[in-house]
């Protein structure tokens, strides 16, 4: 009598292959889910870092605003804070002013501690404008630094005499505070309020 040979039948092999394929697919889906979640988390972390950097630079600029007007195209415009709709060629609100506190250790660089800066919205990007000197010569183009993308609106508000105002028309005096509102595609409306250290002060070079 012949002894039965050991091993798996074709049906058993097919069943084993099907089970292995099912387990492999499940493991792959779990791995893909983990990788996708990790990628989303990294993108959100990068976005939050961009927001933090933009607001940090904005805070440094605004809080160190000084009551000094600058020359534009060779002429003194006598405006301390130029803030308006479509100002600085913005697609929404834009602003420009002179700030202090621009570090120049031991006077190593051929410039002062004052800097002309501006902020605007262009093509859904929040941009920071800066010049090497507070009174740039005619034809000088600013350095344009993109700070945030996916921005749909930029609004400014000005604090004076205990209230927030939607416009700033005083040429030779600074407001006490400035609020910036950004509409973002992913985070909605964000508002930051900044105290201007030189708020209420008039132009140092008014004459």
UniProtKB/Swiss-Prot annotation:
Main location (coarse class): membrane
Q: Topology versus the membrane, per the UniProt entry?
A: Single-pass membrane protein
Q: Which GO terms describe its biological process?
A: protein secretion by the type II secretion system
Any Pfam family the entry gives: T2SSJ
Keywords in alphabetical order, please.
Answer: Cell inner membrane, Cell membrane, Membrane, Methylation, Protein transport, Transmembrane, Transmembrane helix, Transport
Record's subcellular location: Cell inner membrane
User: Might you report a single GO cellular component term?
Assistant: type II protein secretion system complex
Give the stretches traversing the membrane. 8-29
Do you know which SUPFAM superfamilies this protein is assigned to? Pili subunits (SSF54523)
- Where N-methylphenylalanine occurs, residue numbers? 8
**PROSITE patterns, per database record:** PROKAR_NTER_METHYL
Propeptide, chain numbering:
1-7
Q: What's this protein's function?
A: Component of the type II secretion system required for the energy-dependent secretion of extracellular factors such as proteases and toxins from the periplasm. Part of the pseudopilus tip complex that is critical for the recognition and binding of secretion substrates.
Quote the protein name from its UniProt record.
Answer: Type II secretion system protein J
The organism of origin for this protein:
Aeromonas hydrophila
């Amino acid at each position: 009598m012949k002894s039965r040979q050991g091993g798996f039948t074709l049906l058993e092999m097919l069943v084993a292959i099907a089970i292995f394929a099912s387990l492999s697919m499940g493991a792959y889906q779990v791995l893909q889910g983990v990788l996708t979640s990790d990628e989303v988390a990294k993108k959100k972390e990068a976005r939050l870092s961009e927001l933090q950097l933009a607001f940090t630079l904005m805070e440094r600029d605004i809080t160190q605003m000084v009551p000094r007007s600058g020359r534009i195209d060779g002429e003194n415009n006598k405006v301390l804070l130029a803030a308006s709709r479509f100002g600085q060629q913005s697609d929404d609100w834009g602003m420009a002013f002179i700030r202090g506190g621009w570090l120049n250790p031991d006077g190593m660089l051929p410039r002062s501690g004052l800097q002309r800066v501006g902020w605007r919205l262009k093509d859904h990007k929040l941009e920071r404008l800066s010049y090497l000197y507070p009174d740039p010569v005619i034809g000088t183009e600013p350095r344009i630094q993109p700070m945030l993308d996916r921005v749909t609106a930029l609004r400014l508000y000005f604090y004076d005499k205990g209230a927030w105002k939607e416009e700033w028309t005083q040429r030779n005096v600074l407001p006490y505070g400035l609020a910036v509102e950004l509409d973002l595609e992913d985070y909605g409306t964000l508002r930051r309020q900044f105290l201007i250290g030189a708020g209420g002060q008039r132009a140092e070079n008014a004459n």
